[in-house]
A protein has these predicted regions:
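Short, positively charged and aromatic/hydrophobic N-terminal segments
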Residues: 2-9
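Short alpha-helical scaffolding segments that buttress acidic/His motifs in well-ordered protein cores
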Residues: 277, 301-305
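C-terminal helical "lid" subdomain and adjoining coupling/linker elements of P-loop NTPases
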Residues: 287-294, 307-383
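Initiator methionine at the very start of the polypeptide chain
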Residues: 1, 13-14
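Conserved ASCE/P-loop NTPase catalytic core
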Residues: 14-271, 282-299, 307, 312-317, ...
Length: 492
């Protein structure tokens, strides 16, 4: 997420075919040069930086904070640990590092650990090169396959990461002393690539000790064997800066061996969060029904998350993920779609009444710290109101609301809610002409009934939250708006 999505992608297999070299001899003739993984990444990063190209696509909000630090770490050849709360695009950035690898890399054919044709380390590769020399066959590995990842869990073992004796190979008649009986773990299998460990504190401390050699001596030692395999990997890890679940910690010697420690953060600006939501959200669509989200409602969604991150009633140790904004955006659009389907409308625009749907998408993503039981719903409603009011004050000029207020003081009464169709709500412009200038400033040229209805409801709710109108709230999330100086009985 900042953010970019998710963060769960690889660069995608290229359509560029692999080079044609099939033996070590042909590889030498092609002029290919073997480089350590960190030098390879550094050179490709330098090329992009000099060409003024971004190192990572789709990551927003880090241009002046995280990215300069990461560029420094890459240029320095450091292993990196990212510290940050959930939903800060740590995994996405890590996975994006594959874009700095050469597109194709040669290995000894059949190698389990991506042996360098010029410097083989496994017994299989050494035997093959010793037997065939420069006629030894090679194969090509795409950069997407040079990335390995492990989500740290308490039950992760040394065998998972480093390797162990394969009992099946022993049962086939091989000796225990034979190196070919080894079953390599994830780290050796990512040799000459990038290996990532997510949620590093969840890895038990004795397993973390096993990573020390990789970071310092750059080799792995397999239990029961005297062999030491020199492994060439860029090791990257992610962790929460303060593990609020108290599941574990990073041991000091391991943390000390990471060359750079980079802190991530949530979007610093509302505009950045809006950009991320537009990039990541997948609003629903059904048949010929279209859902269009206006800019001011996008800002309400983003502002909700921004306010939650500064609220004393929200547990800040657990964080307020950018995924909250994405989920709220999608559920708001879904509620608008459901409303439109029930009313038989094909053009749907989310309204303020659709924000009530946040209850489902917010519940599992923020932790409310309320002294009284059952206060969670009220805290959520207060955040929604504060978000609408904040955006209303940003986008609506107070001078424009005075004429609208005068219409209500003359006795105007307006009903809104899920059961009010867009055409009916848009007709308010005829009854209260003073709404027209404000609505025009919000709809950005989209004068459809759905767009006008959404803008009208947003203006009325903003005026209510600004204490200029009274509102009798209905069960549908809408309500009846009237002047604060006129009682309900006076309008009957």
């Amino acid at each position: 997420m900042p953010f970019g999505s998710s963060a769960y992608y690889s660069q995608g297999m290229s359509s560029t075919p692999a080079p044609s070299s099939a033996t070590i001899s042909q590889l030498k003739s092609s002029g290919w040069i073997s480089r350590p993984i960190k030098e390879e990444i550094r050179l490709n990063a330098v090329t992009k930086i000099m060409a003024k190209q971004p190192l990572f696509e789709g990551v927003l909000g880090y241009e002046d904070t995280v990215m300069p630090q990461l560029e420094n770490a890459i240029l320095a050849g450091h292993d990196v640990i990212f510290l940050g709360e959930r939903g800060q695009a740590k995994t996405r950035i890590i996975r994006s590092l594959t874009g700095l690898l050469d597109e194709w890399m040669p290995i000894i054919a059949g190698s389990e650990i991506n042996d360098d044709p010029y410097n083989p380390v496994s017994k299989h590769a050494r035997d093959l090169v010793e037997e065939l020399g420069d006629d030894a066959p090679i194969s090509w590995v795409h950069r997407d396959l040079r990335y390995g990842e492990k989500l740290a869990t308490p039950d992760t073992s040394i065998a998972d990461l480093i390797g162990e004796v394969d009992p099946i190979k022993v049962a086939e008649g091989r000796y225990l002393s034979d190196e070919l009986t080894l079953h390599y773990g994830l780290v050796p299998r990512t040799n000459r690539g990038i290996f990532a460990i997510n949620e590093l504190p969840d890895l038990s401390e004795r397993i973390q000790v096993g990573l020390l050699n990789i970071l310092e001596e750059r080799d792995v030692q397999v239990r029961g064997y005297k062999i030491r395999l020199p492994i060439d990997v860029l090791l990257v890890a992610s962790a929460n800066p303060e593990d609020y679940t108290n599941r574990g910690r990073i041991i000091t010697p391991l943390k000390d061996r990471f060359g750079s420690q980079i802190r991530t953060h949530y979007p610093l600006e509302t505009d950045t969060e809006v950009q991320i939501v537009r990039q990541e959200a997948r609003p629903p669509s059904v048949g010929n029904v279209t859902v269009t989200v206006p800019a001011y409602m996008e800002r309400v969604v983003a502002t909700f998350s921004q306010l939650a991150r500064s609220s004393s009633q929200v547990n800040q140790r657990s964080g307020v993920s950018v995924r909250l904004s994405v989920s709220n955006y999608e559920v708001m659009a879904a509620n608008a779609l459901r409303r439109g389907l029930r009313l038989g409308e094909t053009n749907v625009v989310p309204r303020v009444c659709d924000l009530e749907a946040f209850a489902a998408s917010t519940g599992g993503k923020i932790e409310i710290e309320a002294l009284e039981e059952g206060r969670e719903g009220q805290v959520l409603r207060d955040l929604i109101k504060a978000s609408v009011l904040t955006v209303f004050r940003e986008v609506v000029s107070p001078e424009l609301t005075r004429a609208v207020l005068a219409s209500f003081e003359e006795g105007a009464v307006v009903h809104t809610g899920e059961d009010v169709g867009s055409e009916d709500q848009a007709m308010l412009l005829g009854n209260i002409p003073a709404l027209r200038p404000i609505v025009d400033s919000l709809i950005e040229g989209d004068d459809s009934a759905a767009s006008v209805a959404a803008a009208v409801e947003f203006v009325l709710e903003g005026m209510h939250l600004s204490k200029r109108l009274n509102k009798d709230t209905s069960a549908t999330g809408g309500g009846t708006y009237r002047s604060r100086t006129v009682t309900p009985s006076a309008n009957n």
